[in-house]
Protein backbone atom coordinates (compact mmCIF):
# COMPACT_ATOMS: atom_id res chain seq x y z
CA UNK A 1 0.00 0.00 0.00
CA UNK A 2 1.42 3.35 -0.93
CA UNK A 3 1.71 6.19 1.56
CA UNK A 4 -0.87 8.19 -0.38
CA UNK A 5 -3.29 5.25 -0.48
CA UNK A 6 -2.82 4.67 3.24
CA UNK A 7 -3.40 8.35 4.03
CA UNK A 8 -6.53 8.34 1.87
CA UNK A 9 -8.01 5.30 3.55
CA UNK A 10 -7.09 6.77 6.95
CA UNK A 11 -9.05 9.93 6.12
CA UNK A 12 -12.04 7.84 5.06
CA UNK A 13 -11.81 5.72 8.22
CA UNK A 14 -11.63 8.81 10.45
CA UNK A 15 -14.58 10.37 8.65
CA UNK A 16 -16.55 7.13 9.08
CA UNK A 17 -15.97 7.34 12.85
CA UNK A 18 -17.20 10.94 12.90
CA UNK A 19 -20.28 10.04 10.85
CA UNK A 20 -21.08 7.18 13.22
CA UNK A 21 -20.83 9.59 16.18
CA UNK A 22 -23.33 11.92 14.48
CA UNK A 23 -26.11 9.34 14.46
CA UNK A 24 -28.85 10.51 16.82
CA UNK A 25 -28.73 7.16 18.65
CA UNK A 26 -25.04 7.85 19.34
CA UNK A 27 -25.67 11.35 20.67
CA UNK A 28 -25.64 13.31 17.41
CA UNK A 29 -27.78 16.42 17.77
CA UNK A 30 -29.88 17.26 14.68
CA UNK A 31 -30.09 20.86 15.92
CA UNK A 32 -26.30 21.24 15.80
CA UNK A 33 -25.16 18.74 13.16
CA UNK A 34 -26.04 18.64 9.47
CA UNK A 35 -25.18 14.93 9.37
CA UNK A 36 -27.33 14.15 12.42
CA UNK A 37 -30.17 15.98 10.69
CA UNK A 38 -29.71 13.85 7.56
CA UNK A 39 -29.71 10.68 9.66
CA UNK A 40 -32.89 11.80 11.42
CA UNK A 41 -34.60 12.55 8.09
CA UNK A 42 -33.66 9.09 6.82
CA UNK A 43 -32.91 7.38 3.55
CA UNK A 44 -34.95 9.63 1.27
CA UNK A 45 -33.18 12.81 2.42
CA UNK A 46 -29.77 11.16 2.10
CA UNK A 47 -30.59 9.77 -1.34
CA UNK A 48 -31.86 13.15 -2.48
CA UNK A 49 -28.53 14.73 -1.47
CA UNK A 50 -26.62 12.01 -3.32
CA UNK A 51 -28.69 12.72 -6.42
CA UNK A 52 -28.01 16.45 -6.12
CA UNK A 53 -24.29 15.91 -5.62
CA UNK A 54 -24.10 13.44 -8.52
CA UNK A 55 -25.76 16.01 -10.77
CA UNK A 56 -23.35 18.72 -9.59
CA UNK A 57 -20.44 16.37 -10.31
CA UNK A 58 -21.72 15.73 -13.83
CA UNK A 59 -22.13 19.46 -14.45
CA UNK A 60 -18.65 20.24 -13.10
CA UNK A 61 -17.15 17.66 -15.46
CA UNK A 62 -19.12 18.95 -18.44
CA UNK A 63 -18.16 22.55 -17.63
CA UNK A 64 -14.48 21.61 -17.22
CA UNK A 65 -14.46 19.72 -20.51
CA UNK A 66 -16.20 22.58 -22.33
CA UNK A 67 -13.61 25.00 -20.95
CA UNK A 68 -10.73 22.68 -21.86
CA UNK A 69 -9.74 22.24 -18.23
CA UNK A 70 -7.88 19.17 -16.98
CA UNK A 71 -5.73 18.31 -13.99
CA UNK A 72 -5.37 21.08 -11.42
CA UNK A 73 -7.52 23.37 -13.57
CA UNK A 74 -10.44 21.01 -13.09
CA UNK A 75 -10.52 21.46 -9.29
CA UNK A 76 -14.31 21.96 -9.29
CA UNK A 77 -14.64 18.29 -10.23
CA UNK A 78 -12.62 17.26 -7.17
CA UNK A 79 -14.73 19.55 -4.97
CA UNK A 80 -17.99 18.05 -6.24
CA UNK A 81 -16.74 14.46 -6.08
CA UNK A 82 -15.73 15.11 -2.45
CA UNK A 83 -19.32 16.19 -1.73
CA UNK A 84 -20.62 13.10 -3.53
CA UNK A 85 -18.30 10.76 -1.63
CA UNK A 86 -19.21 12.43 1.66
CA UNK A 87 -22.92 11.92 1.12
CA UNK A 88 -22.45 8.33 -0.05
CA UNK A 89 -20.49 7.75 3.15
CA UNK A 90 -23.48 9.09 5.11
CA UNK A 91 -25.62 6.53 3.26
CA UNK A 92 -23.15 3.74 4.03
CA UNK A 93 -23.18 4.69 7.72
CA UNK A 94 -26.97 4.74 7.71
CA UNK A 95 -26.85 1.09 6.63
CA UNK A 96 -24.12 0.13 9.12
CA UNK A 97 -21.46 -0.01 6.39
CA UNK A 98 -18.06 1.68 6.15
CA UNK A 99 -15.66 2.84 3.45
CA UNK A 100 -13.65 -0.30 4.23
CA UNK A 101 -16.56 -2.37 2.90
CA UNK A 102 -16.35 -0.49 -0.41
CA UNK A 103 -12.55 -0.72 -0.53
CA UNK A 104 -12.80 -4.47 0.08
CA UNK A 105 -15.29 -4.81 -2.78
CA UNK A 106 -13.00 -2.82 -5.08
CA UNK A 107 -10.08 -5.06 -4.05
CA UNK A 108 -12.20 -8.12 -4.84
CA UNK A 109 -12.85 -6.74 -8.33
CA UNK A 110 -9.24 -5.73 -8.93
CA UNK A 111 -7.85 -7.53 -11.93
CA UNK A 112 -11.26 -8.56 -13.24
CA UNK A 113 -12.41 -7.18 -16.51
CA UNK A 114 -15.68 -5.30 -16.38
CA UNK A 115 -17.28 -8.05 -18.44
CA UNK A 116 -16.09 -10.75 -16.01
CA UNK A 117 -17.21 -8.73 -13.00
CA UNK A 118 -20.66 -8.19 -14.47
CA UNK A 119 -20.98 -11.90 -15.29
CA UNK A 120 -20.02 -12.79 -11.70
CA UNK A 121 -22.92 -10.69 -10.42
CA UNK A 122 -25.36 -12.72 -12.54
CA UNK A 123 -23.97 -15.91 -10.99
CA UNK A 124 -24.64 -14.51 -7.49
CA UNK A 125 -28.34 -14.20 -8.19
From Swiss-Prot:
Pfam families found in the cross-reference section: PRA-PH (PF01503)
InterPro entries per record: HisE, PRib-ATP_PPHydrolase-like
EC numbers for this chain: 3.6.1.31
Keywords: Amino-acid biosynthesis, ATP-binding, Cytoplasm, Histidine biosynthesis, Hydrolase, Nucleotide-binding
Primary localization class, coarse: cytoplasm
Single GO molecular function: ATP binding
Record's catalysed reaction(s): 1-(5-phospho-beta-D-ribosyl)-ATP + H2O = 1-(5-phospho-beta-D-ribosyl)-5'-AMP + diphosphate + H(+)
Highest taxon listed in the record's lineage: Bacteria
Gene3D superfamilies: MazG-like
Subcellular localization: Cytoplasm
A GO BP annotation: L-histidine biosynthetic process
Cellular component GO terms, alphabetical: cytoplasm
Cross-referenced NCBIfam families: histidine_hisI, PRK00400.1-3
Similarity-based family: Belongs to the PRA-PH family.
Entry protein name: Phosphoribosyl-ATP pyrophosphatase
Organism: Cupriavidus pinatubonensis (strain JMP 134 / LMG 1197) (Cupriavidus necator (strain JMP 134))
Name of the encoding gene: hisE
